[in-house]
Amino acid sequence: MELSQTALFIGSIINLNALVLILRAWLQFARVDYYNPVSTFAVKMTDPVLKPLRKIAPTVKNIDTSALLLIFIIGMLKGIIYFGLSVNVLLVLGVLTVLKSIGLAIFYVLFIGAVLSWFNRGNNSISYAFYQLSEPLLKPIRRLLPTLGMIDFSPMVVMFILLFLNNFMLDLLGGLWIIAG
């Protein structure tokens, strides 16, 4: 079945919203400064939809479960809207959407952080937010793989791992993995 351009556009908007929701949950989990511009943006974009959900899914141990629940629901709605899938498949699709959104968020944060590190040598709050988000992921890799001069290969290693996992899930789940994100 071929999707129309409108469906692809709507899917892109849905995926972008899922990324902002993951970013919001990740910022809270990493305890990035609330007044950082990246945090402020994520909070302003997501608060209108997350505040009502917090009554159902409160924050647990610094994990914003309301954001994860909303991404789960979004994944299920995509399955209903696009393909009219059964309930069992929708539940799996919701979980896959959360997982794929987390992977995409990690990829984009690492990529943007790496690009910012090339151009920005000063004290910048946006760069610092990306540093706070990526450092817990990169620190174990840096212990195994030392930097060569001023070049840090740890973001590339994590991105290759994400690429491998994405291809593995695509081989394992096929179209369901594509629908998830």
Swiss-Prot record:
Q: Which Pfam families match?
A: YGGT
Question: Which Gene Ontology CC terms are recorded?
Answer: plasma membrane
Name the membrane topology term: Multi-pass membrane protein
List each coiled-coil range: none
| Superkingdom assignment | Bacteria
List all membrane-crossing ranges. 3-23, 67-87, 92-112, 159-179
Keywords attached to this Swiss-Prot or TrEMBL record, sorted alphabetically, are: Cell membrane, Membrane, Transmembrane, Transmembrane helix
Q: Where in the cell is it found?
A: Cell membrane
The identity of this protein, by name, is: Uncharacterized protein HI_1036
Q: State the organism named in the record.
A: Haemophilus influenzae (strain ATCC 51907 / DSM 11121 / KW20 / Rd)
